[in-house]
A protein has these predicted regions:
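Phosphodiester-processing cores and adjacent nucleic acid-binding clamps
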Residues: 1-38, 59, 110, 115, ...
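Transmitter module of two-component histidine kinases
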Residues: 8, 47-48, 100-103
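Short acidic, Gly/Ser-rich segments with clustered Asp/Glu that frequently serve as metal-coordination loops
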Residues: 40-48
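Short coil-to-beta strand junction motifs in C2/discoidin
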Residues: 51-53
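Short acidic-glycine loop/turn motifs at beta-strand connectors
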Residues: 60-64
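A structural motif specific to WD40 beta-propellers
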Residues: 66-68
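Active-site-proximal helix-loop-helix substrate-binding element of RNase H-like nuclease domains
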Residues: 70-97, 125, 132-166
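Catalytic-core regions of hydrolytic enzymes
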Residues: 95-112
C-alpha cells in the first residue's frame, strides 16, 4: 500500500515484483575500453585476517588478450594445509615472490583505465581494497561480477561455479 501511494503521488506507474537499478551515466561501462579479468588466491575468506598469495590476470581489448599479469605474493606467511589442498600453492612456491605492497602497486598500474572482471568479484575486490588501503593504494575501477551475471542469466544451471558456467 505504501509503495502504491508513493507511486501515485509521484505520478509514476509501479510494476510490482520488478527490481530496477539506476546507475549514474559516469558508472556505465564503456564497451570500447580494455578489461582486466582477474582472480586471486588467498589464505582464507576474510580479508582482515587472511592474505593474498597469488594474483593472476589478463587484459583484453576488442576480445583479444593484450597483456598478462601473474605473480605469487610473499609476506612471510605459511600456507595452511587446507589452502594448499584447495589451490595447489605451497609455502615454498612463494619464496622469492614480491610482497603485497609491490604486487598491488604493479596490479594497480596494470589495471589503470580498465574495467575489472572476476567470478565472485565482491570477494576478490574485498581483498584488493582491504590490502591496498594498507598502502594508500585505491582501486576505483568499475567491475563486473560473472557470478552475479550467471545467476541472473543462467537459471537452469545446477550451480554457478566457474567450471560450470564456462
Amino acid at each position: 500500500p505504501a509503495a502504491a501511494k508513493a507511486a501515485k503521488k509521484a505520478g509514476v506507474k509501479p510494476i510490482f515484483g520488478v527490481e530496477g537499478y539506476l546507475l549514474r551515466e559516469s558508472e556505465l561501462i564503456d564497451m570500447e575500453q580494455s578489461y582486466v579479468v582477474f582472480d586471486l588466491e588467498t589464505t582464507g575468506l576474510k580479508p582482515e585476517q587472511c592474505e593474498i598469495i597469488e594474483v593472476g590476470a589478463v587484459k583484453l581489448k576488442d576480445g583479444k588478450i593484450i597483456d598478462r599479469f601473474q605473480t605469487f605474493v610473499n609476506d612471510g606467511v605459511v600456507i595452511p594445509a587446507n589452502i594448499t589442498e584447495l589451490t595447489g600453492i605451497t609455502t615454498d612456491m612463494l619464496l622469492g615472490a614480491p610482497n603485497t605492497r609491490e604486487v598491488l602497486t604493479r596490479f594497480h598500474d596494470f589495471c589503470e583505465g580498465s574495467c575489472l572482471v572476476a567470478h565472485n568479484a565482491e570477494f576478490d575486490m574485498s581483498f584488493v581494497r582491504h590490502h591496498a588501503a594498507r598502502f594508500n593504494i585505491e582501486f576505483h575501477n568499475l567491475y563486473a561480477d560473472t557470478l552475479m551475471l550467471s545467476r541472473y542469466l543462467m537459471h537452469d544451471l545446477i550451480n554457478h561455479k566457474l567450471d560450470t558456467v564456462c
